[in-house]
Design a protein with these regions (language model features):
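Basic- and aromatic-lined ligand-binding clefts that recognize polyanionic substrates
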Residues: 28-46, 131-185, 198
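Structured C-terminal subdomain patch of bacterial secreted/periplasmic proteins
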Residues: 30, 93, 113-129, 219-272
Length: 272
């Protein structure tokens, strides 16, 4: 057997091995636990739903329940033998350390402060899982929301962004994703408290009417499917237009925001 023939066999073996490894990286995925429905939605958008082996108690998927972001179920997580656990940065490092198997990797996503974090989260997951075939989807989402947000034309109308009229509502302020989104859409969000302001008895602002009187917005955006009776009880000193939009399209950091932007574009005549 000639040296040239043996050398050719070695090259063939190395090449085939490399191709097999590359194929595994592109078509196989690790065992993933999703600790929030919005993370599950992101994985589904990236074509990775079949990689999920466990989900939080709030998820719709029929899979083993692994607790929540703040209180993960360490025992169940351990039995599922995950390669990767994806959670939110709301989960403390101490909690993560106590509930993560030694063989698993944890990804703590930042999702609630800026719109750009949504696409950064997708890129982070792709890098950690080698799921490179989903890269075009990240690009598509990035281009879509940036294009749509420019079509809303908020005309610098002063607005307040409220989670609801009922229960314990909160207002979105600087360093929150919705503040960032509506600012990029051309509105002037007038809330000044960072992240969110809880409106309830005993707080600085105890009811919605007081919030409106303080900031005197042109528009009040309520993220509920329909206006509740509590909304009709708002009686500010200066009249304000109240607009209601489906919270499912805005409140969670996922790709549903594209549908939300479409609705804003369809309604832009209301704030000309």
């Amino acid at each position: 057997m000639s040296f040239r023939y043996i050398f050719s066999l070695i090259l063939l073996y190395i090449s085939s091995t490399f191709i097999s490894i590359s194929h595994a990286n592109s078509s196989e995925c690790p065992r993933i636990i999703s600790q929030s429905p919005y993370i599950t939605e992101m994985l589904t958008y990236l074509g990775m739903q079949h990689c999920i082996v466990g989900v939080s108690r709030y998820d719709k998927l029929d899979l083993p329940r692994t607790g929540g972001i703040l209180d993960p179920d360490a025992e169940t997580i351990d039995t599922l033998m995950p390669d990767i656990i994806i959670t939110s940065d709301w989960a403390t490092k101490e909690t993560v350390k106590l509930t993560t198997p030694k063989t698993a990797k944890v990804i703590r996503l930042k999702s609630f402060y800026k719109m750009i974090q949504l696409e950064e989260n997708m890129a982070t997951v792709i890098k950690a899982t080698h799921w490179v075939q989903a890269t075009p989807r990240v690009t598509a989402f990035k281009q879509a929301w940036r294009k749509k947000v420019k079509q809303v034309h908020g005309n610098q109308k002063k607005v307040l962004l409220l989670s609801s009229c009922s229960g314990t509502p909160y207002s979105f302020g600087p360093d929150s994703r919705l503040y960032d989104l509506f600012t990029q859409a051309g509105f002037k969000v007038v809330e000044t408290k960072e992240k969110i302001r809880h409106i309830r008895p005993g707080n600085e602002i105890e009811h919605i009417t007081a919030l409106i009187d303080l900031y005197q917005p042109d528009l009040l955006f309520i993220f509920e499917q329909r206006l509740r009776k509590q909304c009709q009880m708002i009686t500010p000193k200066v009249p304000v237009s109240i607009l209601s939009f489906d919270g499912k399209l805005f409140l969670q950091p996922n790709t549903e925001i594209l549908k939300g932007l479409d609705i804003l574009i369809q309604n832009k005549e209301r704030w000309k």
